[in-house]
Regions:
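Conserved P-loop NTPase motor cores
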Residues: 427-460, 469-481, 495-503, 635-755, ...
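Extended, folded cores of ATP/NTP-driven motor/assembly subunits in large transport
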Residues: 1-399
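Short secondary-structure boundary/capping segments
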Residues: 85-90, 126-131, 374-377, 484-489, ...
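Short glycine/proline-enriched loop/turn "hinge" motifs that connect secondary-structure elements
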Residues: 23-29, 101-106, 317-322, 414-416, ...
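A short, charged
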Residues: 443-467, 809-839
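P-loop NTPase motor domains
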Residues: 40, 47-63, 262, 355, ...
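Conserved P-loop NTPase
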Residues: 750-811
Length: 839
């Protein structure tokens, strides 16, 4: 005959009486205030910051009255990533979202319950749980003053935590606890073990201790309820070996192994019971005396006496607060095989903390029941152990998932732990918060580190959000993306300009739309001519600077007073040769102060009939105003020390002109390796000017380099670029680990940032193809993210010549349809990966 378990309605045993004024009131008159807690992001906290977080928890708990319970509940629930697209995205954006669709990850939410209970309730054992009896109201229910004092202490607790700058607490409203018609509340979520935003189906709760179930979910419980199960010592944090090196540390909280590092559905519960400290110590004194008197009969009594004395000595000499503590991991699965795996995984993670895994099969229902929000006062006293407040808080999980930026603008990067997309704003939101003062970016990544993939990924998303982008490249890194944009816009955008002998890049430095020459325009002209005149390592004398400035200003006066004169470099050269020569002769400027003949001789190749006469005498301007994606490819002249700096300056001046015309529109100039041509002492002021000016016009300048020696050896880089780039982006630096001290000093990196950077690509997931990247903002906010792209994006971004040629050949076979060729290539890549996986 089948045994039938006794059943009852949840309502008959439910321990919560009401939720009023945002407080949970139990049927035993316990009052609970609930909070949602925002913890720091995983892998972004240092040992010192963990100690600060620990100290804040301790300080906050000390303001709570006796017989309070601090119950921290961390939920870790498996979910699948859902695409956020609305059908209006670009081809590559859709591919990106499709690539990640349904990817599983562990979602974390942290709640904190502060409960005021009574002396009698604090001592009750599991056999006196509300699961087993009715309700007896304590006499304290009539003491309204104790309630008021508790609520005042809760407010102090909240202020202390929020003022710390590391942890944020938000008090939950009544509807968030009990739920609404549209959304389940916290209590309903706990009773169904689900974090969905829709009401779950009603389910039976089976409270069999050995096989507890909630609907189809089978539960297992591991507890830390005895000091014998704990390690000999605990700390605020621990070294995470997988992301550490012999030159850097990655730190995690002591309880991190049972947090995000435990990849299954689970709730990690941490209880701290604040009883009467004096009463606890008196009881310990009595126990100590008893152990001493019985020590002759058993050696264990003598050992217990010594432990009790040590505990009392610590409490009295250091002023430590004695408390009771309990932690447990409640995990669940929907089939027996998975449940067995989860049991083993949970036990292994507890062992990583130095704890003895204790699988509880007796008190699972009672411990689950006391975990109901507002019912912490029902916790069985025998499941807790005595310790000090400082040690108890060490068992708190202190980190959470990466968070997306609450901003409409940004880029999609990937969480390095779970591999799901994040929305990251590294420009606007940090500016509004005062984290950075400019949007400029400095990118450092050696060859093969994924630098081109990241920059392609960055500019593609900026472009799709309306940014005007101008790129100066020397390696055809953006050819695929530019071609795709060109095809999608039917030639209206995606302009790819290469320097060719029969069609060179040219412009007129003396041309302006309005005919006006402000200070900035005059300075750019002087910088250009100085670059033509002086060698890279040759700084001008003060007298030469004055003479050049006088020549430029005098010529500008001439062309502004006489509009019939066509301004160009030829006209300037002739003006200096004839008119300005007479002017300096009248001033009696000595030849050693300004050698005008030497000046003209050096500039002659750029004058009419010279080798480069086309460069600065263009009769038409590069009209880039309405083109949003332009690439200047300068690979053909990357080794020409005369042309490269001049052409790069021309392009930058063109960008500045565009920048001034487009009001209220985001602009970006990204300069790849050719920035090195601009690093002479003569150009440092102009580079500083560019980096400072773009901020005023809603723009950002981005410099990309791969050689560490370039930044170590050039003081101009530090003064002109690094100091004016509040966003620094570094890729894998392992090959420069021995040189990293120099890089750290030059970039002004903290030890925390150093540890993050050297952890890049140390523990990548073997089944995913991605490269990690470190992003630092203003020296105060930083983290490592992953650049993972879809197969379609890979086909567009790749810099491998064989892969680029394969794509171009296929596009030609398909009648020039590049998008279709990208889709075909991506499908081939997916088929290869599937076949390799099967093999």
């Amino acid at each position: 005959m089948r045994s039938v378990l006794k059943a009852c309605d949840l309502e008959d045993r439910f321990p919560i009486l009401a939720v009023e004024n945002n407080c949970i009131v139990s049927k035993d008159a316990d009052i609970t205030v609930a909070f949602e807690v925002e913890l720091p992001e995983l892998y972004t906290v240092t040992a010192a910051e963990y100690e600060a977080i620990h100290g804040t928890w301790v300080k906050a708990m000390k303001v709570l009255p006796n017989y309070s319970v601090v119950y921290k509940q961390d939920w870790f629930v498996k979910e699948n990533y859902r695409s956020e697209g609305d059908g209006t995205e670009s081809f590559l954006s859709r591919s990106y979202e499709r690539h990640f669709n349904e990817r599983p990850y562990l979602r974390h939410r942290c709640f904190l319950y502060l409960t005021k209970t009574t002396r009698e309730r604090a001592r009750r054992r599991s056999d006196f749980s509300t699961l087993c009896r009715g309700y007896i109201l304590p006499k304290e229910i009539t003491d309204w003053d104790s309630v008021v004092k508790f609520l005042e202490a809760v407010e102090q607790f909240e202020h202390i935590m929020n003022d710390s700058g590391h942890v944020r607490m938000k008090r939950l409203r009544t509807e968030e606890v009990v739920g609404t018609e549209e959304c389940p509340g916290l209590i309903e979520r706990y009773l169904t073990l689900g974090m969905e935003d829709t009401h779950p189906v009603l389910q039976d709760i089976c409270l069999d201790p050995e096989r507890m179930r909630i609907g189809d979910k089978r539960l297992c419980l591991h507890v830390l309820s005895d000091t014998e199960d704990l390690p000999g010592s605990v700390g605020t944090d621990m070294r995470y070996e997988r992301l550490s090196t012999d030159r850097s540390d990655c730190r995690l909280s002591f309880a991190a192994p049972v947090g995000l590092l435990l990849s299954c559905n689970h709730v990690y519960s941490q209880y701290v019971f604040i009883d009467d400290a004096q009463e606890i110590l008196q009881r310990m004194e009595k126990t100590s005396r008893n152990m001493l008197s019985l020590s002759k009969y058993s050696r264990s009594n003598a050992v217990n006496y010594e432990w009790a004395e040590m505990y009392l000595d610590e409490a009295h000499t250091k002023g430590l607060v004695p408390v009771r503590c309990h932690c447990n991991v409640l995990a669940w699965a929907e089939d027996e095989e998975e449940l067995r795996r989860i049991k083993n995984d949970t036990g292994s993670q507890l062992a990583l903390m130095g704890c003895v895994p204790h699988y509880n099969t007796i008190d699972t229902p009672v411990l689950y029941w006391s975990g109901i929000p507002g019912n912490a006062g029902d916790f069985p006293a025998e499941e807790s152990f005595y310790t000090f407040l400082e040690q108890a808080v060490c068992l708190f999980a202190s980190e959470t998932n990466y968070r997306s930026s609450p901003s409409p603008f940004g880029i999609r990067m990937t969480d390095r732990q779970s591999g799901v997309p994040l929305h990251l704003d590294i420009s606007d939101l940090p500016m509004r918060k005062g984290i950075i003062t400019n949007r400029n970016k400095f990118i450092l990544g050696p060859s093969g580190s994924g630098k081109s993939f990241f920059t392609n990924h960055l500019v593609r998303q900026y472009y799709e959000q309306g940014t005007h982008i101008l790129l100066v490249d020397t390696g055809n890194s953006y050819q695929g993306l530019c071609s795709l944009i060109h095809d999608r816009t039917h030639g209206e955008d995606g302009i790819y300009i290469t320097y060719e002998e029969d069609n060179p890049i040219a412009f007129n430095p003396f041309y302006t739309d309005s005919g006006e020459f402000d200070v900035e325009k005059r300075e750019s002209i002087k910088t250009l001519i100085l670059t033509l005149w002086k060698r890279e390592d040759e700084a001008p004398r003060r007298s030469e600077e004055v003479a050049l400035s006088g020549a430029v200003n005098a010529y500008i006066r001439r062309i502004t007073e006489n509009r019939d004169v066509r301004p160009d470099f030829n006209g300037f050269y002739e003006f200096v040769r004839d008119d300005y020569r007479r002017m300096i002769e009248e001033k009696k400027v000595r030849e050693k102060d300004f050698d005008i003949d030497g000046f003209l001789n050096v500039l002659e190749p750029f004058y009419r009939g010279g080798d480069y006469d086309f460069l600065l005498n263009s009769d038409k301007e590069l009209d880039l105003t309405n083109k949003r994606f332009i690439v200047f490819e300068l690979d053909n002249i990357s080794g020409n020390k005369v042309l490269l700096p001049v052409v790069t300056l021309i392009i930058m001046e063109t960008f500045i002109a565009k920048m001034r015309r487009l009001k209220g529109i985001r602009k970006m100039i990204l300069i790849e390796e050719c920035w090195k041509a601009l690093m002479s002492a003569n150009m440092s002021e102009y580079i500083k000017y560019l980096f400072k000016t773009v901020r005023k016009y809603f723009g950002e300048a981005v410099v990309v380099t791969q050689e560490v020696d370039d930044i170590i050896s050039s003081p101009v880089v530090k003064e002109a670029i690094i100091n004016n780039s509040d966003c620094k982006i570094l890729l894998d630096q392992r090959k420069y680990m021995n040189k990293f001290d120099h890089i750290q000093r030059l970039l002004g990196l903290t030890d925390k940032e150093r540890g993050q950077i050297l952890s890049i690509n140390q523990a990548n997931h073997p089944e995913r193809f991605y490269r990690e990247v470190w992003i630092g903002l203003g020296g105060t906010h930083s983290a490592v993210y992953a650049t993972e792209v879809s197969d379609e994006e890979y086909a567009v971004y790749t810099t491998e010549e064989s892969e680029k040629l394969e794509l171009q050949k296929l596009a030609k076979e398909l009648g020039g349809n590049l998008e279709l060729a990208v889709k075909r290539i991506a499908e081939i890549r997916r088929e290869r990966k599937m076949s390799n996986g099967k093999a």
